[in-house]
């Protein structure tokens, strides 16, 4: 193959793009990683922690990534319950009762380092330039760069939200809406052992999540994801001592004495859904396809689900000798993932709006739903299965099998 001809071109420099590079290496397809000029180092100091489903963790293991993570033994979802206040509704997911792992909490930096160590990519696999145009031919697309370089690719995979230029050259359109909320994330040190318990508190202005982390140098640690009205964020973060005092008042009952372990970061929350995930030879996955509210902690699991479907299509293309955009698996992806993705994003948005509403109808609905779910193990299992990779049919990598294992 010509040195500028590739099976896939992978756009982005985050975790999703790196896993996609790993998929390409694992299944023997040629690829180039187009990182872009401005994005190359943006993820170096990311302090977030991610909740991986058991299926996602198993998928990474098949690809050679064994992550050191904290298993979630219980996921405790509460309306109220902070500042020694009354608990108005609750759902408890217990891994022992469900007989399956709920989630695994791992720091972004740990995942990133594990991926980079496994990949060990040299410069021949990547480009740190931004494309200026993409044209379509019958059997491939051409990607043009400012430095006159031209790349040919059978499939262009976008893993991060497309900037204005990329939207224009790929004819991508998004539907946007603003949550009018901002998320705060940081790592907390606390006096009590987290016991592997995760908490999700639904508060008046948005959810607050505590995710258990593994101990570091005998220190008890948890990750905080706190969503507040954007208009309140500057006050919440104005003073570290006041921020710590507020967290102790809210969560001290569960974690003991709390200290902020790393400086918090904040980011505004917006919902974005692409109108089509497959446009000619351009496919959008992960953050390129959707931005969702963080209350369920499912954004990266959804990205890995995209990748698992795409891996099936790549293997099918090789086995059957078909152009990848003609493969049944990719056509199924286009149809099925759009429906799944939209339903998931809108469902999470609906839950957020219901818990922020002060109407008596919304209060009655959410508390009755929490009571129903908490008393029905079958509903808990259904929710846990959907979060873990799909309650019904799953792609091969999410059932602990190599991609393409279902293809005859």
Where do the model's predicted regions map?
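FAD-binding beta-loop-beta segment adjacent to the flavin cofactor pocket
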Residues: 267-284, 342-343, 359-361
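Conserved N-terminal helical subregion
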Residues: 3-4, 58-61, 70-169, 176-184, ...
